[in-house]
Design a protein with these regions (language model features):
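Flexible "cap/lid" subdomain of the alpha/beta-hydrolase fold that forms the substrate-access gate
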Residues: 1-125, 129, 150, 156
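Catalytic histidine-centered segment of alpha/beta-hydrolase-like enzymes
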Residues: 133-142, 146
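Alpha/beta-hydrolase-fold serine-hydrolase catalytic core, especially in secreted/extracellular enzymes
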Residues: 143, 155-158
Length: 158
């Protein structure tokens, strides 16, 4: 609510729910979404025709992206209307469960201050930073991400 940069970065969540952006995303079996994702992934050295075909097959099914859009509709009220009751499970909730966040430093979806603040909510948090990686580290650096997860699990996840 209070971080203006994050508000700007999150504005897509509101515009994709309805209206022109929603229609352009979902028309022609989500073609725009498929094109945008594949265009971004095509820059990766390990992205190949088989992977593109798989993405297009999965994302090209009518309704394939509806669940994500509906999640935004159901769970994120307009910023100016957010109240303490909108926070789930609660505004000051925390966990002691060992937690791992794999964070791409080039992620344009979330501001880095959010990552710094997570320690206040997850007391047993491990953050693994990936330089020059964006919002989808599991797609951009799958070998390293899998190694980090394996190490986290092998060391008692904490």
């Amino acid at each position: 609510q209070t971080n203006e940069t994050q508000r700007e970065r999150s504005s897509y969540m509101y515009s994709m729910r309805d209206g022109d952006l929603n229609r352009s995303m979902t028309q022609n079996n989500n073609q725009r979404v498929c094109d945008n994702i594949c265009r971004g992934l095509s820059k990766l050295p390990h992205f190949n025709e088989d992977m593109e075909r798989t993405f297009r097959q999965g994302l090209g099914v009518p309704g394939a992206i509806d669940a994500g859009i509906n999640w935004y509709r159901a769970n994120i009220p307009p910023v100016d209307a957010i109240t303490d009751e909108d926070f789930w499970p609660g505004k000051h909730a925390s966990t002691s469960v060992p937690s791992l966040l794999i964070w791409g430093d080039a992620d344009l979806t979330f501001v880095s201050e959010f990552i710094d603040d997570l320690a206040g909510y997850a007391e047993n948090l491990r953050v693994h930073h990936l330089p020059e990686v964006g919002h989808s580290p599991m797609l951009e650096q799958p070998v390293e991400v899998n190694a980090v997860i394996r190490h986290f699990l092998a060391t008692g996840a904490g």
